């Protein structure tokens, strides 16, 4: 599937849907614009692996929706560059995967300092972030949901936590794997924010870079 034009999805809609072929993996090349609706809408949905090339173009995501979703267990490859752009509404996620083969090196920056409850990357595979994420209150930069390693080499800024409702602002988090803020990495959190969060018997958090606590009671 190749998209160099403009796609508009409604609420709970999907812009591009791709599924593994009987003859092998499918490939999506996106260099156009996808405007994603609200309420669990998705820009690009890849089922059972495949290849995604997002080296230019844009994905503009509404509220409580997703830019890219990857599900299944077959091998998945993601190529992206800093020329690609993603905008996110409240409660939305740039990249979500439940595919353990997902190995993502991210170059796409995110910038919504007033957005609430945004997730940058949520994936069980290996994650390397080289880009800048500036997100608002109750947001999470990188969530490692697997047993692998997520590494931040870029900049992650999140706002304040809502501790009363247990909605936290976190730079990087995991309950089963490892999160690393690399020597070139920088994480900044607001009031009651958490720079690195590892909660689980086998989880680990490692800081080799800079963590800035910009608000009261952060950690």
Please provide the spans of the model-predicted regions:
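Beta-strand-rich solenoid/repeat architectures in extracellular/passenger domains
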Residues: 1-12, 24-41, 51-64, 76-91, ...
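Extracellular beta-strand-rich solenoid/capping regions of secreted or surface-exposed proteins
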Residues: 20-21, 123, 174
